[in-house]
């Protein structure tokens, strides 16, 4: 009888131990499931975002503050984008992240070019620009060149980079010959959302653009015969600036709602034709000139040596071009075109397209695919 009691007690004890272990495991599993259910959504979202938009960091990952460099990626000009990125990344050891604004049908070409060449070392993110935001905001004159929507992407930097506080914007027809960190560190005065290089600076004003009157003043971009322009009280002889290179304080940009201010003047131009037709066909500079009138800081002139694309001749001396920190081929004569100024400087940084869709055009019609 006593033996049966002992046997029953042992069985009951074993059952209790089993139930305790089972209870513990169930609690642990419940905790794991609870944590997974609360964390899985953002983790999946972040992973998809990384795969969709970001190139993985290179093995020799660069440390320090992120320097955001924004460049448009237009299909027919991708050679310019690649050369610009190569020149920047080769001249700095800083943690540069390239934000390439493009369209969905160009993303694959960009990835192929950057990931399949020596540029696989760079870190970049592809940002899709929704051109529908421009509906009703861009006037198209009869006989004018087709509007290129990507040129307005610079107006929407805070929307495209919502978490970024400061960024550099560059057109795709530039070459950087110094450490981009120096440009990024350009001091911006309190209340200023951007820094530009004035057209009346000591560098560019010495080399006038042939045949262009009022080439460096507001009157060359805005129609001062219109009452709405005159009522702003802006002096017609105020120095203009080129918006192809600038440093932006995006925190201040958001605070002042600069994007909406720019859109306002775009819409008013559609209704009232406020831009001047005497100098150039620029439709991006006028709203920027209005919004940033006497409210922008200045870049070092050597960080925006421009007008190399205004003619096929050599505007500057070889010594000066070598000393420049950033060269800009704004104008019709691009460095990848048939004729241009100092194409050899640009070609130094060009990397041939692995897909064979882009090649510089040179004299006699041959394509030059050399680096």
Swiss-Prot record:
Residues 1-7 are cytoplasmic. It is found in: Membrane. It is an enzyme of class 2 (transferase). It is a single-pass type II membrane protein. GO terms for cellular component: membrane. Keywords: Glycoprotein, Glycosyltransferase, Membrane, Signal-anchor, Transferase, Transmembrane, Transmembrane helix. Residues 29-371 are lumenal. Glycans are attached at residues 104, 249, 257. Pfam families: Glyco_transf_8. The chain crosses the membrane at residues 8-28. Belongs to the glycosyltransferase 8 family. This is Glycosyltransferase 8 domain-containing protein 1. It comes from Xenopus tropicalis (Western clawed frog). The gene is glt8d1.
């Amino acid at each position: 009888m006593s033996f049966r009691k002992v046997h029953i007690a042992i069985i009951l004890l074993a059952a209790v131990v089993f139930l305790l272990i089972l209870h513990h495991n169930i609690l642990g599993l419940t905790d794991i499931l609870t944590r997974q259910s609360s964390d899985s959504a953002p983790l999946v979202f972040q992973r998809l975002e990384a795969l969709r938009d970001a190139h993985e960091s290179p093995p020799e990952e660069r440390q320090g503050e992120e320097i955001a460099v924004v460049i448009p990626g237009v299909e027919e000009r991708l050679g310019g984008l690649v050369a610009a990125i190569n020149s920047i990344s080769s001249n700095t050891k800083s943690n540069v992240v390239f934000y390439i604004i493009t369209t969905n049908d160009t993303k694959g070409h960009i990835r192929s070019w950057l990931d399949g060449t020596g540029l696989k070392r760079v870190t970049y993110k592809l940002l899709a620009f929704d051109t529908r935001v421009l509906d009703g905001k861009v006037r198209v004159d009869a006989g004018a060149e087709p509007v290129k929507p990507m040129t307005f992407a610079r107006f929407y930097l805070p929307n495209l980079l919502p978490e970024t506080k400061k960024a550099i914007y560059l057109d795709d027809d530039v070459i950087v010959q110094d450490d981009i960190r120096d440009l990024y560190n350009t001091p911006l005065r309190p209340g200023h959302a951007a820094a530009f290089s004035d057209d009346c600076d000591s560098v560019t004003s010495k080399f006038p653009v042939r045949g262009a009157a009022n080439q460096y003043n507001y009157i060359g971009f805005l129609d001062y015969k219109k009452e709405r322009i005159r009522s702003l009280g802006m002096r017609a002889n105020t120095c203009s600036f080129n918006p192809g290179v600038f440093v932006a304080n995006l925190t201040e940009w958001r605070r002042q709602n600069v994007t909406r201010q720019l859109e306002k003047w775009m819409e008013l131009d559609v209704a009232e034709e406020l831009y001047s037709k005497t100098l150039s066909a620029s439709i991006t500079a006028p709203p920027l000139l209005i919004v940033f009138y006497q409210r922008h800081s200045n870049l070092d002139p050597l960080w925006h040596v421009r007008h190399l694309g205004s003619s096929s001749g050599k505007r500057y001396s070889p010594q000066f071009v070598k000393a420049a920190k950033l060269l800009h081929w704004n104008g019709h004569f691009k460095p990848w075109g048939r004729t241009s100024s100092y194409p050899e400087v640009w070609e130094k940084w060009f990397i041939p397209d692995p897909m064979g869709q882009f090649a510089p055009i040179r004299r006699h019609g041959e394509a030059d695919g050399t680096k």
